[in-house]
């Protein structure tokens, strides 16, 4: 069992052993929180994208807790941007607890202006 009482699913590491993402999901009514641990990159972003696509039909709020995210690539940014677009007419999306490396990427790319950051 995972932190939120759900079965944990983990992305398989890449052949280089460097790409790994653990996604913990919590649902509270129509609010979904995703706690990301590891790297959100080309290898791991499809798993998060699939989870987002599963919940957006019922979601009024998506929260991404990035307190344990070590790295985010352009592929990861695209997934978060897609989530923002999916929630545009339905509710809100929040990104919180950015680590320093992830915060730098958000600032350098201008994504810090696109998201609600807590």
Model segments located where?
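Polybasic, Ser/Thr-rich amphipathic helices
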Residues: 1-8
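STAS-typified acidic loop motif
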Residues: 12-48
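Amphipathic alpha-helical interaction surfaces in cytosolic regulatory modules
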Residues: 42-114
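Short acidic-hydrophobic, aromatic-tinged amphipathic segments that line or gate anion-handling sites
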Residues: 116-118
């Amino acid at each position: 069992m995972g932190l939120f009482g759900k079965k944990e699913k983990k992305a398989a590491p890449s052949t280089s052993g460097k790409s790994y993402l653990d996604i913990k999901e919590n649902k509270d009514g129509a609010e979904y929180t995703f706690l990301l641990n590891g790297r959100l990159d080309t290898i791991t972003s499809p798993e998060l994208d699939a989870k987002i696509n599963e919940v957006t039909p019922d979601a009024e709020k998506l929260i991404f807790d990035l307190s344990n995210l070590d790295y985010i690539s352009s592929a990861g940014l695209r997934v978060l941007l897609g989530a923002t677009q999916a929630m545009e007419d339905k509710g809100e999306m929040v990104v919180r607890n950015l680590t320093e490396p992830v915060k730098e990427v958000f600032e350098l790319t201008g994504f810090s202006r696109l998201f609600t950051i807590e």
